[in-house]
């Protein structure tokens, strides 16, 4: 069975083809440069870019896989969450393709795709694991069982900014480029992560154990920089970037390891765009090794949004015998995560 996956939840247009847990081919187009001058993603710009890119990207993915559309057995698509107009472009394209081919359509949850993509690199997921999903729009700790069949348990989420969003905003304060994650990562290489003690929110005993908050550290950086400039001093960009990055990585990895311990699982899955950050990865490796946990992190190119991850979760659903979604499937920009299928657990 060959599953074609379509991703369009934000600013990447992705198509991937997966069969039996093996990535056959994928392609990606990004409208990131078009958003750079705005300092963030503009939904209508993203949607227009998806419209222009979806067909060429699909042909490129098929070409890499050495396949034709006639070889596709099922279509999976991100039906939420995400930017409304962006999600709708991918969903409409996937519906049209499924209808034209007479193949089943599976509307999947974007975050389940991030978890499923690791299967393409490291094989089947452990029977139970904790997933730390960290991106521009999401920061969540999830307890996973059988990803295709079981309910996904939310252990905690951010109560304000996602980690990736905080990276973008701090990068803007420091005059670095967009997107902020890679810019801060590069700047931090020459900095001292202990130079400035930025706050670690929700770290007290009485705070939610697995809740996150990055609005405070973002504001703390802005105020520190403003005070330095008002005093006529030069802003040590590398030190600020490294200290901010350390604060975020510390909270993310500490809470993720604690979740594994408390729930009796021995594997941590680190996924999402921020999983590409070198300090987050390094600290996760260090803390998982100390705790005797297996750490699974997809290749960097599969950490950010892509079509392969949607094909991967679609492949799991097809092999598990999940019911198809049907062509009346609607987009849900704020879809709650209860299962890999947007409609929730089915078994």
Curated annotation (Swiss-Prot):
Signal peptide: none annotated. It is found in: Cytoplasm. PROSITE patterns: GLYCOPROTEASE (PS01016). One of its GO terms (biological process) is tRNA threonylcarbamoyladenosine modification. Binds 1 Fe(2+) ion per subunit. Its main location: cytoplasm. Belongs to the KAE1 / TsaD family. Required for the formation of a threonylcarbamoyl group on adenosine at position 37 (t(6)A37) in tRNAs that read codons beginning with adenine. Is involved in the transfer of the threonylcarbamoyl moiety of threonylcarbamoyl-AMP (TC-AMP) to the N6 group of A37, together with TsaE and TsaB. TsaD likely plays a direct catalytic role in this reaction. This is tRNA N6-adenosine threonylcarbamoyltransferase. It comes from Kineococcus radiotolerans (strain ATCC BAA-149 / DSM 14245 / SRS30216).
């Amino acid at each position: 069975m060959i599953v074609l996956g379509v991703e369009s939840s934000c600013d990447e247009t992705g198509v991937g083809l997966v069969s039996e847990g093996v990535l056959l081919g994928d392609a990606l187009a990004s409208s990131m440069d078009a958003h750079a001058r705005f300092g963030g993603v503009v939904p209508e710009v993203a949607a227009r870019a998806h419209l222009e890119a979806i067909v060429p990207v699909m042909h490129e993915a098929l070409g890499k896989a050495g396949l034709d559309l006639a070889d596709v057995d099922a279509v999976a698509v991100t039906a939420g969450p995400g930017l409304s107009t962006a999600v709708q472009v991918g969903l409409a394209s996937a519906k049209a393709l499924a209808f034209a081919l007479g193949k089943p359509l599976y509307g999947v949850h974007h975050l389940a795709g991030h978890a499923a993509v690791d299967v393409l690199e490291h094989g089947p997921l452990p029977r139970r694991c904790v997933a730390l999903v960290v991106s521009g729009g999401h920061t969540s700790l999830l307890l996973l069982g059988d990803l295709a069949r079981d309910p996904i348990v939310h252990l905690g989420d951010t109560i304000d900014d996602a980690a990736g969003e905080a990276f973008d905003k701090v990068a803007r304060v420091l005059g670095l480029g967009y997107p902020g994650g890679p810019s801060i990562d590069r700047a931090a290489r020459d900095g001292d992560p202990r130079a400035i003690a930025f706050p670690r929110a929700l770290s007290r005993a009485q705070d939610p154990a697995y809740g996150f908050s990055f609005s405070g550290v973002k504001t703390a950086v802005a105020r520190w920089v403003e005070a330095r400039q008002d005093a006529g001093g030069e802003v040590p960009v590398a030190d600020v970037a490294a200290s901010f990055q350390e604060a975020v990585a510390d909270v993310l990895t500490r809470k993720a390891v604690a979740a594994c311990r408390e729930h009796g699982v021995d594997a941590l899955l680190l996924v999402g765009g921020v999983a590409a950050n070198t300090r987050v990865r390094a600290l996760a490796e260090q803390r998982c090794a100390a705790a005797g946990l297996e750490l699974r992190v997809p290749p960097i190119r599969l950490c950010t949004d892509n079509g392969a991850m949607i094909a991967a979760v679609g492949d799991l659903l097809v092999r598990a015998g999940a019911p198809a979604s049907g062509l009346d499937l609607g987009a849900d920009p704020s879809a709650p995560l209860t299962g890999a299928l947007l409609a929730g657990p089915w078994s």
